[in-house]
Amino acid sequence: MNGNTRTKRSLKNMQTALLFYIINLVLAFISRKVFIDHLGIEVLGLNTTATNILGFLNIAELGIGSAISYTLYHPLFEKDRQMVNEIVSVQGWLYRKVAYVMILGACILIFFFPLIFKKMELPMWYAYASFIVLLVSSLFGYFINYRQIVLIADQKEYKVTYCVQGGKTLKYILQIIAIMWLMHGYVYWLVIELLVSFIIACALNVIIKKEYFWLNTYPSKGKLLRKKYPEIITKTKQLFFHRIAAFVLSQTSPLIIYAYASLTLVAIYGNYMLIIGGITLFVNSCFNGMSAGIGNLVAEGNKAKIKSFYWEMVAVRYWFASILCFSLFMLTNSFVSLWVGEKYILPQSTFILLLIYVFIVCTRVHDLFIAAFGMYQDIWAPALEAGINIGCSILLGYYWGLNGIIGGVILSLLLIIFCWKPYFLFRSVSYTHLTLPTTSRV
């Protein structure tokens, strides 16, 4: 693929992601405000907690998608359709295994809901219904539209974005209407969540069939085909540890907050995390569209071009992060006051800690390059990151509450993400060929 085509597709991915980012961010804020006003802060806290528990089950995905994406760069670059079919068949087989593990784990977890939600004042069916609907919605991706990875690896992620984010826009609008105008609004909210998720999965499958008419995958043959592609299993095993660290970073803080406080504080923290999540999603929308392009660049093997592009990305992302953090510092509390009320504003010290977290997350340039090279062998790093995160969050949270919990998260990010990962990338690249290896065959 020539540089112009790569740049064009990257820009199209970025533009599409940015468009839907703005639309869905606005709708997410409106939806959350409507949720609080019409259903109450505790229902919102319950929904957040159920999402975090589901995130725990999603660890079972093990990073298979990232491993598959890495192994698809070369056959797509070489236009090897047979290899693409076989690799995605392996993915389908692995995803079915993951789905069964998630279902089993969910069945076990449900028995503990009376203990997990014993402080909740809502009827217990709220917890069961919320969790089951979110679980089924998540399972659609494992059974129906797992093949979207081909579009993403082929730098056509904008088509996935149109379908998924367009469907999410429709979902937000329908859920807002249901909560505001219908009795038993939360029941309709859950029905819409499930129905739209199913429609999105089916629509995406139609797009994939139209775009890749030659893509014929057979998950039932995945068990045999995986022996031809040991790289997938190797990378998946390595990525498992990285997935755990990512889960700990994104999902455990609300659970620890709930353990020390209440669903109300979880929801207040969630309000700020919606803003922060919106900012980080904005940065990712601008830059993650380049991920397949970086993989394609690595496949070319031009060391000087890769190094030059890396430092350009560093400069741009640090500039972006600085401006965004300053803007957040000046505007966030005023916005929260207007949005949901002054009683939902966090203390200034807590807010400063959240800004430090935002800056570190928004400057993670190395992640895209590590993914393109498939360098996941530092399995001790995410294990240590998760250990520091959980251990320090629990310990510091006991003494300093929410500030201590966020401080534990920041400490783990500083040591592993800010210090180790850039060093690991440059050290590893210095001792390896700058070409994407072909997937080995037996």
Label every PLM stretch briefly.
Residues N13-T16, S130, K159, T234-K235, ...:
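Membrane-interface "helix-start" segments
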Residues V26-L44, F117-K119, I179-M183, F240-F241, ...:
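Helix-terminus/linker motif at the lipid-water interface of multi-pass membrane proteins
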Residues K8-N24, L62-L115, W125-I132, A304-L324, ...:
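Membrane-water interface segments that mark the loop-to-transmembrane alpha-helix transition
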Residues L62-E78, A153, Y212-T217, I276-V314, ...:
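Helix-loop junctions and terminal segments of transmembrane helices
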Residues M1-S10, Y186-W189, L204-Q251, G293-N296, ...:
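Interhelical loop/hinge segments that connect adjacent transmembrane helices in multipass membrane
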Residues F20, N24-A28, A50-S69, V133-I152, ...:
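Short runs within selected transmembrane alpha-helices of multi-pass transporters and secretion channels
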Residues F35-N58, I87, Y186-V191, K227-K235, ...:
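Interfacial/gating helices of multi-pass transporter permease domains
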Residues G3-N4, L11, F113-V133, L328-T363:
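Interfacial segments at transmembrane-helix termini and the short loops linking adjacent helices
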